[in-house]
Structure formats: structure tokens, C-alpha cells
Curated annotation (Swiss-Prot):
PROSITE patterns: LIM_DOMAIN_1 (PS00478), LIM_DOMAIN_2 (PS50023). InterPro entries: Fhl1 (IPR042997), LIM_FHL1/2/3/5_N (IPR056807), Znf_LIM (IPR001781). A zinc finger (C4-type) spans 7-31. This is Four and a half LIM domains protein 1. The modification N6-acetyllysine is found at K4.
Amino acid sequence: MAEKFDCHYCRDPLQGKKYVQKDGHHCCLKCFDKFCANTCVECRKPIGADSKEVHYKNRFWHDTCFRCAKCLHPLANETFVAKDNKILCNKCTTREDSPKCKGCFKAIVAGDQNVEYKGTVWHKDCFTCSNCKQVIGTGSFFPKGEDFYCVTCHETKFAKHCVKCNKAITSGGITYQDQPWHADCFVCVTCSKKLAGQRFTAVEDQYYCVDCYKNFVAKKCAGCKNPITGKRTVSRVSHPVSKARKPPVCHGKRLPLTLFPSANLRGRHPGGERTCPSWVVVLYRKNRSLAAPRGPGLVKAPVWWPMKDNPGTTTASTAKNAP
């Protein structure tokens, strides 16, 4: 008698029918799907006997459900990478490890043009001006906190303007008396020499280098005829000049004492006037008369006149007998 060839679960005869052998038992397709089939981790449906099955680390998928978790590309016949319980294709794996654009928050993959600033990256077209929204790309820009501005918008909103040319100062600016200047605009009004870091003199809102001030602006000293200049950068300079005085005159001859370089100017006439050596006057203390003038060739030195009657001072007789 022939052995019965029946389904292990429903006992239906399997002769002439499709069946599946599972764990040493034979079962019809219907019972296989019901009792033996693995469940797809993607769609949560049984993987029937007539379906293709993909498995990885005790997990099972329909071949059509085995796709990249990012781009949904089918991976049944391709290489893949499992990361954080996700199945990824090679391209998405690269993107997963790639930096994210600060503008669109998408991955920057190999071949994408990008801009990097202080550890942050953007797609080239995502790096735009915070004001006008124009693409900055790889052009010049100015950072302001978390914002970035193109050159034009920065000049309009933030840049100082030169007091001379009224153009924006983007680099190389200087400040003088709380006013901003381009370094190329702050120059000597005469020779156009740059004055930044140099000594200069300001005269009525005009600025001169040291040489031009000496040659063209500075007043000349009445005594030495040299220019009156300051020793530091000031708006006004001064020169210590005494008021002009008439030269002292000899009481006797009424001649300027400058004609007598050897004159001792401390010798004085009793009236307080200075006397040249040729006209030394001798004062007699008692009668306060004047002695006759001595000849120019006979005078050797002026006489010192005592200002007070102190003991031991020169008397009239000693002055008279002086050689």
C-alpha cells in the first residue's frame, strides 16, 4: 500500500500539487503562507512561497521591499550598508557621513561646489547675502554675527564713510579727531604725501607734512629767520619769541651797548642806566658828584657800584685811585 503524501497541516493530498518542504515536513502553499512563511520587516506581510525572499541578520524582506531607506532604490541584487538598523545604498551612505549645508540642510556630497567658513559649510548657491539674498558664492563678504553681507549691502548698512571722498571705508581706514578717513585720502594738501603714522600739522582744516609746513606755511622767526614749527603733531604751533626791545644805550655816549661786546652790563649809572666801559662813572658817596669821563684807551675794567651803604664796600677814594 502506497504511503500517503499529504500536507502536514491540513492533511490535503499533495499529489499533483505544488508544495514546500519546511523543517522536514511537507505543506501546501496555503498552509506555508499561514504557518511557515517569514514576515517582511518592511511591509509586515508574509513572504509567500511564490515570492523571492531576502534575508540579513535574521531579518527578512520581500525582494521588492528590500530598498534603501533614503532614496528607496531596490537593493536585492546590489551591495548595501546597514547603519543604525537602516539599509542604505552606497551613495546614501556617503551622504549620510557628509556634512550638511547650513542653508538647505542637505548633505554636501563629492562634486558639489561648497563654501566653508569657520567650520560651517554651504552649497555655493545657498551662501547668500542676508540683506539682498543675492548669491555670494566664493565672492567677498562681511560677517555680522550669524548674518553675512555682500560688499554693497555692508557699505550701505554698516561701513563708515570717508570725510573727504564720502566713499565707504572697507579697509585701511584711519581716524583723526573722531572722523574716519581712507589712508589714501589723509594726505598733505601740498605734496600729497600720506600722513598716516607721520608727523603733520593742521592749519584751518588743512593738513601739511613737516617739510611743506616749514617751507610754505610756517611763520619765520624775527630773530633767527627760521620757520616756527612745533615738535609734535598739533593743530597750532607756537614759538617763544620775546617782545622786541631797543638795545641798551650808554648813558654817557648814548651809543648802543651792542657796540661794546666786552662791556660788563652790571656796571650801571646811578640813575639805573647801563654804561659802556669807555664811560665808567665814579660816584662819590658823600657829595654824589660825577667824575670826569676817562678816555677809551685808559679804561681797563668797569667799576662796580655798591647798591647799599654796607661796611667794607668800596669808597670814593678807592674808586678814584683804582688803576
